[in-house]
Amino acid sequence: MKGRIHSIETFGTVDGPGIRFVLFMQGCALQCAYCHNPDTWDTTIGTQVTVEEVLAKIEPYLEYYRRSGGGITVTGGEPTLQAPFVAELFRECKKRWNLHTALDSSGFCDPQHAKELLEVTDLVLLDLKMMDREGHIKLTSQPNDRILRFTAYLAERQNQIWVRHVLIPGITDSPTDLYEMGRLIGTMPNVQKVELLPYHRMGVYKWQQLGKEYPLEGVREPEKQEVDRANAMVQAGIKAGKEEKKNKVGKPAS
């Protein structure tokens, strides 16, 4: 089986616990305005590799991954577009080395398409963009209906989840939207961590190299106090979501 990849990183430290082998898959159905890897969107380019070829690149660094409590993270692009390939890769990583596996996904995927992949995934890094449907379309080119269905499916499973959200001033920092995102997270018992990632402009040069106009030109990076306020709003939503779930579970059937 072959997959189409963009690149690899052998010493990743921000995409899951420990030191990790990070595999960037090629292809994405979203076109996020702040994307720092727009060169991963096109599904027709990249490098075709077999599972065995990827395993051979992991093996020399196994000791680092094991000692640090790390493993392998597959990101993109959107890795669920190549779910069968990633599932086979994770399956072999577990069979050969019992390696921790993490999937970094936007959730833009039909649940049944990712079922086999999730069965061999220890951790899902779920990148939630926005709760508001129209705002989501403007930001990513796609509605969030499919993402919300996938998120609900994840909540029913045993996979550990880290939720990540990119905070963009004036775009993804609406108090109402952050609160509603928190409410959703609060209903998900398997969410272990929530990270608000401050928007940055480090990928702008890639848009320029591709001859694309950067959609967020002029948008500034958030201040620390703005990130703190956003975190507080999300946490308030999480508290409300947990309380609502608790009351719903404890309510007698009519």
Each language-model region and where it sits:
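Canonical Radical SAM [4Fe-4S] cluster-binding loop centered on the CxxxCxxC motif
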Residues: S7-E9, T13-V49
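Short, conserved loop/turn and helix-capping segments at secondary-structure boundaries
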Residues: Q48, S141-N144, E221-K224
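Conserved AdoMet/S-adenosylmethionine-binding subsite of the radical SAM
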Residues: E59-E63, S68-G71, G76-M202
